[in-house]
Amino acid sequence: MSLNLETLEKSIKALEKSINIYYSYKEDENKDLIETISSGVIQNFEIAYENSWKLIARWLDENISADTSHKTTKKGLFRLAGEYFLIDDVGIWIEFHNARNNTSY
């Protein structure tokens, strides 16, 4: 069974777009505008991150074992994804995980 990447692709494009907008306005003197744009970047990052790990979990469940993703933490999930060559750099994904946790609180 093939996985549908459309939602992930859309969330990554939205994140890239919001980052580009942030960089084009980051020197603006309207701090409320910068804060609002920054919040949009954070929200788009959170969405892309959530879509990413859920897709990784689905792939592992479909290709390794039906409950693989349910037996581990997200960090463990990223380690498994590295073992199966779904991601190149496990460390950066753990950093994404930590960043996601920091944006939530």
Segments (PLM) and residue ranges:
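Solvent-exposed interaction patches of small proteins and small membrane subunits
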Residues: 1-105
